[in-house]
Amino acid sequence: MAEAFSNSLTRAVGVVTTYSGSTVAAASTAITVTAATGIGVSDLVDNANYIAGTRVKQIVGTTVYTHRASTNTASAASQIVNFLGVTTAYTSPSAVKSILIGGTFANNTTSQVNLTVEVFDQSGDKTVGIAHKIPVPTGSSFVISDAGKTLLEGLDEVRVYTDTAGAIDVNLSILTGVS
């Protein structure tokens, strides 16, 4: 396959499910919510009792289990917990290597939003953050460039999360067909 430059455009990124009145168990992976509607496995957990990048591992009834323990030392009741749904902004074609050259993440709302960008390595079934909880002011953007390029193997993904529904427009610059 010959090398080719392209842009991957995604409008209005951001899927958020919020539950108030939640309980975060002490130093535990358990969050008790009033209902689990709208929460999905692999959603990011946005709450002061969890470090950035914590994700939903399992849902049983109204208990959500995360892949890492909370940081609180006592049970925390009456918590507002946001569950951030993923938007896949780019998937490298099967059996094709691509390079993420750069990207622009523009805030299209009237308030500041927080942005998380991750790369999912399909062959290793691992996810790593490029940017976690980056504040993007209204009328502004966050740009990935100059800091190095990211190699994507076949079926690897660039995933985007925001703490506000439909808040970010994504423009990724990609070079495909590299060897």
Residue ranges of predicted features:
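Beta-strand signatures of extracellular beta-sandwich domains
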Residues: 116-120, 171-173
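Short, charged beta-turn/beta-strand-edge "cap" motif at the junction between a beta-strand
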Residues: 49-54, 148-151, 164-166
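Small/polar beta-strand repeat architecture
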Residues: 16-85
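Short proline/glycine-enriched turn/loop motifs at strand-loop junctions of beta-rich domains
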Residues: 36-40, 109-112, 166
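C-terminal interaction-tip segments
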Residues: 1-15, 84-98, 102-108, 161-179
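Intrinsically disordered, low-complexity Pro/Gly/Ser/Thr-rich segments with frequent PxxP/GP/PP motifs
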Residues: 123-157
